[in-house]
């Protein structure tokens, strides 16, 4: 492809806590599953897809609660480092999105290849644009920006179809199970379980 063989993904999953009261389950570890299984499962899935990995080793996993000491089950920061049979992955998750940001989180995905890289700014581009769906590409031939806001996203339509018709057009069940298996194992490792 345009960036060669994918070597690594870096995925961020920032979210906003907000200045409003949340239900009790939001702070109960047994109810929400932990920051890695709750938020990080998406980034783990992306890592597996873009590195074309069908197995992975967990090198590092960490979760912390630094802002809500009165809610000991809450986790506001997490990080994960993975090595798959197709590449490497780093994931950062947090509940630190500042109130001034126009969206709930500045989610990004960086895909590094051996001939270039792609950066996707999913929900905002900070001071440049309040809308999302920005893609930046840099390789040996070009440096390019693409506004992807009008690109059709068939994944969720296909996922609904998969559930109804027991098909695997959005993604395979095997990939879904592997993503969640890794998310749960990583969460447990981070919590020293």
Model regions: which residues?
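Predominantly a Rossmann-like dinucleotide-binding segment in NAD(P)-dependent oxidoreductases
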Residues: 1-72
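A generic structural signal for residues located within well-ordered alpha-helices
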Residues: 39-42, 151, 171-174, 178
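Contiguous beta-strand/loop segments that form the cofactor/metal-binding neighborhood of enzyme cores
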Residues: 45-125, 156-166
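Short acidic, glycine-rich loop/turn motifs
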Residues: 82-86, 136-141
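Short polybasic amphipathic segments
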Residues: 109, 125-140
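Active-site loop of classical SDR/Rossmann-like NAD(P)-dependent oxidoreductases
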Residues: 146-157
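C-terminal helix-rich "cap/oligomerization" subdomain common to oxidoreductases
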Residues: 158-193
């Amino acid at each position: 492809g345009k960036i060669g063989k994918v070597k690594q993904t870096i995925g961020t999953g920032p979210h906003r806590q907000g200045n409003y009261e949340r239900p009790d389950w939001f702070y109960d570890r047994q109810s929400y599953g932990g920051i890695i299984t709750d938020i990080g499962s998406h980034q783990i899935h992306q890592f597996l897809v873009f590195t074309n990995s069908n197995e992975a080793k967990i090198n590092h996993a960490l979760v912390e609660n630094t802002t809500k000491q009165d809610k000991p089950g809450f986790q506001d920061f997490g990080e994960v480092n993975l090595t798959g049979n197709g590449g490497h992955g780093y994931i950062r998750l947090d509940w630190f999105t500042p109130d001034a940001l126009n969206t709930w989180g500045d989610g990004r995905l960086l895909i590094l290849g051996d001939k270039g890289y792609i950066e996707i700014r999913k929900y905002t581009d900070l001071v440049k644009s309040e809308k999302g769906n920005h893609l930046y590409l840099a390789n040996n031939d070009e440096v390019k920006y693409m506004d992807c806001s009008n690109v059709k996203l068939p994944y969720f339509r296909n996922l609904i179809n998969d559930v109804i018709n027991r098909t695997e057009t959005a993604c395979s069940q095997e990939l879904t199970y592997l993503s969640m298996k890794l998310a749960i194992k990583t969460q447990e490792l981070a919590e020293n379980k």
